[in-house]
Amino acid sequence: MLPFRSHTVEICISALWLSSCTSLSPLRPNTTANPTNSVIGQDGYKVAFVEFGEQGSYQDPTQLQNALALIRDTPQPLVITYVHGWQNDVESGDVQSFESLLARLNGAPAIRNVGFHVVGVYLGWRGKITDVPILKELSFWNRKNTAERLASNYDVYDTIASISEEARKDHPGKQYTVLLGHSFGGLIVERSVAHAINAEIHGHADASRSMPADLMVAVNPAADSVLARQMIAALYSRKTEDTRPLFVSITSTGDWATGIVFPIGTGLASVSKGFNEVEAPGPANTQVSERKFYTLTPGHNEMLINHITVDKHETINSPNGLHALEENLQHNHVGNGFTLDGAEGKLDVWQIKRVGDVDVPYWDVQVDPSIIKDHGDIWNERAEAMVAAIFRMANPILNRSAKPRATLHRAPDFNRLEHR
């Protein structure tokens, strides 16, 4: 009877899972009666939605058409494309949080002074499949597998590339694009960056159009650090020192999902896998089992972390009463400094400090939990202010003192790749 009972339990769990799952249909479909349902207008900016199914296919290709038309019709667009993560979709709280960020950017003096017009593109998928307790938490690995399919199949990358192409084609030299991903969305963003870096390194695309955005940011990415190690090593071998960031991976030390849950799951999975000894990027010639990169995310792997946030324990008066986000967009601060809103209208001074001996345009930033508390705490004002500072550091339109862009199309220095 035991096998029968076990089978019955499995059937019951499966039935409960299926009965509680979210819809497979697009949540913002365009129709004959409402052909622009996937675009919403707000005060001063608009947001377009593009949705993908379980295998990474377009759920409604007209959503992409509408997004591209929006970019094409917007003068001097600042395009922010966002890929959400676990426990979100195109109707979750992430939508309102994303719109709130767009509204703050749209109202910032620095953005208005250079003539940017803010456009948001929200890339949606079923990051959330159930609200049932326990099943909700257990969906982490199921959703990770889905995110990996989205990242490896064609349509998601096609959308990301089409967005940047449209902005650059219609507004050459006047546009700026940002690709932002959270959690499993960060995994998708990182895979997109890897394809682009490889294409530029080998001359398949020139620097003006190779990247999926002018700046790519992943916040608390739920991905192993195998790809991160490979990309950092490739950039290090091309001698990309003293250049502005192209890709910034941000992870809070308080992120339990990627810091605790992720290594437990990948540690169990690693038992059945084989791992070579690989070179950690840098001049130290350190070899380590690749298992270390398979089981840890980039922001929890001390062999890859090359920046940390540091509280300078200084305060400054807010120029013109600006909040930290607006101030960080408006002014440069010494040594990759940035400000956070402090007490009594003052601004606290922090720094994104480079650590270690690997200087590449892939920033792997470990963030203090007072800025980002945990895995989902990415939309608070302190986190947004820090990201705004990174945005200025990497944006030569806003910041004429920005460092030069890295030249990637060059032969590698194999001495930087080989164990000696």
Residue ranges and their predicted role:
Residues 1-11:
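Bacterial N-terminal signal peptides that target proteins for export
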Residues 81-85, 182-183, 220:
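The conserved beta1-alpha1 loop
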